[in-house]
Regions:
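Short, surface-exposed beta-edge/turn micro-motifs
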Residues: 3-6, 35-39, 59-61, 72-73
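A composition-biased, non-transmembrane "mature-region" signal
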Residues: 22, 42-43
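Functionally constrained cores in energy, signaling, and assembly domains
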Residues: 7-9, 18, 40, 51, ...
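A generic structural motif
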Residues: 29-36, 63-69
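Short, extreme N-terminal segment that most often corresponds to the first beta-strand
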Residues: 1-35
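Charged interaction segments
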Residues: 43-179
Length: 179
């Protein structure tokens, strides 16, 4: 089975900021305690694109991250409601890259200290030459690690909604949000 992950990562140190974002958006979801300066969020309604209900309510720095292991990956970085950086790479038939909204400066700002170095390391995987290179280099993982995302593998609303009740000990500190 292929991994499909879709999540939001809000820059901050107070879990209440993530809860408030989902509440303003009127969506169900789960908010994870801050780690590495990111508050990880999964929200109902996965569409593999940033949900306008969330981005329209954003007041901070928010990263939308998608990894569809055998198909491609993408990210979009928002500062407030404004899209500041985006990238999409797919490889269903041929490798397709859309980096028309890519901005290393915006990613560096989001990371703060050491951001430029981390972004430079991740840039090596942004333009795969063929499908094998796109899969073998694990670009989504490399990017997520460079961005210091605390959670990104097998991380989506449906997975968390199922596991939250099945394995509560793995979700200590996680807040379930209902509109």
């Amino acid at each position: 089975m292929s991994e499909f992950s879709e999540s939001y990562h809000l820059r901050g140190i107070d879990i209440k900021e993530g809860v408030a974002l989902l509440q303003r958006a009127g969506l169900k979801g789960y908010v994870f305690p801050p780690k590495e300066g990111w508050i990880s969020i999964v929200a109902e309604g996965n569409s593999f694109a940033p949900d306008e209900r969330i981005t329209a309510q954003n007041t901070g720095t928010l990263l939308h991250y998608v990894s569809a292991e055998d198909h491609g990956w993408s990210f979009a970085l928002f500062e407030g409601k404004e899209l500041r950086c985006a990238y999409d790479c797919g490889w269903d038939d041929d490798v397709r890259v859309d980096d028309s909204r890519y901005s290393p400066e915006a990613l560096s700002r989001a990371l703060g200290a050491g951001g430029a170095t981390a972004v430079a390391a991740a840039e090596e995987i942004l333009h795969p030459t063929d499908i094998d290179a796109a899969i073998d280099t694990e670009p989504a993982r490399v990017f997520a690690e460079a961005m210091r995302l605390p959670r990104f593998e097998w991380f989506a609303y449906d997975y968390v909604a199922h596991d939250f009740h099945e394995s509560p000990s793995e979700y200590v500190g996680v807040i379930k949000v209902a509109p």
